[in-house]
Amino acid sequence: MKQNAKVYKGNTAVMKAVNAGEISGGVIYHYYWYGDQAKTKENSAHTKLHFFGNGDPGAFVSVSGAGVLASSKKQAMAQKFLKFLTSKAGQEIVADNVYEYPLLDTRTGTNKALAPLDTLGAPTVDPAKLNSSTVVDLMTEVGLL
């Protein structure tokens, strides 16, 4: 891969290159593809998603988190927002408009276009055991950051 890989600036650029036939495949976050499919399909009309599965590292599931800074001058509003974000209504927005997997229903979520999370065959990884400085170094090295 080091000798033959092409580096693109971002998920959309990779998807455009695959769509145009410039490259035969690329690795992107699924929600870029679902978002484009739901709108114009301009960058994804000639593409399909492939999920690595079988515990392959390429099938990793990244996680997102949210919190409130202790220094925030709007603690109550921020807490209210987080409460909404983690509610059923908030998670429906996450799944239906951003194409992320919702926290509350990881089997299918509300967006039926998403492949059920429990069918993706992701490797077993404990996010709490990941070394964030090593991850950042690797992502920087390959141009993701």
Predicted feature residues:
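Ligand-binding pocket segment of bilobal, Venus flytrap-like solute-binding proteins
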Residues: 1-52
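Soluble non-cytosolic domains of exported or imported proteins
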Residues: 8-12, 27, 71-76, 88, ...
